[in-house]
């Protein structure tokens, strides 16, 4: 069995896990998530923990067991604590603000960029050059942050653009004559 799958998933208090066949549903203070597990993986629930085992000893089943464990751990963490991704806007006149269910970005284009905030994700702007994406689904939070960054990724000469807060942009040297 994979090293990841050997560790059980601890279910914190306030989080409710329901298993029905291969379907798992997790409810918590930050929301609820449901997912259908692969048939090669069996899930077992004992008081406060979830364990995972492959139904057969094939390479694929063992790999899927570790993947399933990681995804379920992310579901439990998401509904109990949530996930967040921070973005920074670097550049003259680059700013962001939230109006209702739309994120308005001014990124140096001739027009403002309007991003419709999807359901299950909240976006906050603590300052005009900061964007915080929060939600229970780790994949969706990362996807939304990547889409916002994709409007104007950091360019390699001056570093202008939208970047993750923990991202280091390696600047190139300008061409010399």
Curated annotation (Swiss-Prot):
The keyword 4Fe-4S does not apply. GO terms for biological process: cytoplasmic translation. One of its GO terms (molecular function) is structural constituent of ribosome. It comes from the Bacteria. InterPro entries: Ribosomal_uL6-like, Ribosomal_uL6-like_a/b-dom_sf, Ribosomal_uL6_a/b-dom, Ribosomal_uL6_bac-type, Ribosomal_uL6_CS. It holds the Pfam family Ribosomal_L6. One of its GO terms (cellular component) is cytosolic large ribosomal subunit. The keyword Transferase does not apply. Keywords: Ribonucleoprotein, Ribosomal protein, RNA-binding, rRNA-binding. PANTHER family: 60S/50S RIBOSOMAL PROTEIN L6/L9 (PTHR11655), LARGE RIBOSOMAL SUBUNIT PROTEIN UL6M (PTHR11655:SF14). Part of the 50S ribosomal subunit. This protein binds to the 23S rRNA, and is important in its secondary structure. It is located near the subunit interface in the base of the L7/L12 stalk, and near the tRNA binding site of the peptidyltransferase center. Belongs to the universal ribosomal protein uL6 family. This is Large ribosomal subunit protein uL6. The lineage of its organism: Bacteria, Pseudomonadati, Pseudomonadota, Gammaproteobacteria, Chromatiales. The gene is rplF.
